[in-house]
Amino acid sequence: MTPTAPTLLRPTDPADVSRLLAGARAVAGGTDLLVQRRAGAEAPTLVDLTGLAGARPAVTSDDAAGELTISAVHPLTDIANGLTDGAGVFPALTAAICQFASTTIRNRATIGGNLVTGSPAADTVPALLAAGAAIDIVTPDGGLRTVDLAEFLLGPRRVDLAAGEWVTSVRVPQPPVEGGFRKIGGRRAQAISFLNLAWQWHREPDGRLTGVRLAMGSVAPTVVRLRTAAAVLEAQLPTQDVVDAAVAAIDADISPIDDLRASAHYRRRCAAGLLREALLPPSGTARADQYVTPTTREKNQ
Ligand SMILES: Cc1cc2nc3c(=O)[nH]c(=O)nc-3n(C[C@H](O)[C@H](O)[C@H](O)COP(=O)(O)OP(=O)(O)OC[C@H]3O[C@@H](n4cnc5c(N)ncnc54)[C@H](O)[C@@H]3O)c2cc1C
């Protein structure tokens, strides 16, 4: 059955949003919501948050506080441009956006939508979780509450957001210059991740890694930190033995399941390959694909 067209409201002043959201639903890029609508999800009145993007920059850096503020309502393209134009450095998020869907989707999709959809496979979430993000949420009375991203993610498609609340921005402690993101999907573009990994660390002058933070998607009910593997790496030189130990430690951090995209077995092998690849560049010999055989037979075994 074709859904009836919703009423679309497009505020440009953030102060108007809470009032308009009473009994309505937020929409940003619409790249998840419109798919849900086709599947029959109801949304009688939509409040389009993208009109708010003109009121502020996509990314701001507060050097004194050592913090980056990233808009939840700008398209991902604007966020990536903000990060590469010198507004701040966040290599893992920049890499995640570059591997996200396709240019057309990146020109529409937002971080707010990616967070609120609550998918364990969401591609911006590992970088934000690894960086220790805090989510700024506007409450129905126009107040502000802040919640750690780790507590915001409650389960598959479930987040800590009440009716009438909306996400205005995400704040992270300024990430180190060394970080990255890699995903494995069924193809290079327009692919939901079978698995994804974000990492960040400082590399000390003697080569040891400190402040190691890793987060992985599609291996648990929510995106998760790889705390055990990170602890193995902390303050160590990433020698072959240390990398082997960190890769072996991943099993304690993840609980993948078989689903229509990939088997748990395949995901465990990909998880090992992705971490090895993150730790052993740029010799070029340690690509994740070399550690997995992405055949349909294996994915389903
Ligand atoms: C072809 C295609 C390819 C895709 N590829 C990827 C991919 O590679 N990686 C990936 O992670 N995802 C992918 N997706 C999923 C989707 O693009 C992302 O989840 C995207 O970030 C959603 O953002 P949006 O702004 O479009 O959200 P919308 O669709 O506008 O909204 C999604 C949900 O979030 C709510 N919402 C939106 N913004 C806010 C806010 N600021 N505050 C409160 N609630 C809000 C809406 O009410 C709705 O429930 C893909 C989707 C499509 C259609």
Each predicted region: which residue ranges?
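C-terminal structural segment of proteins
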Residues: 1-301
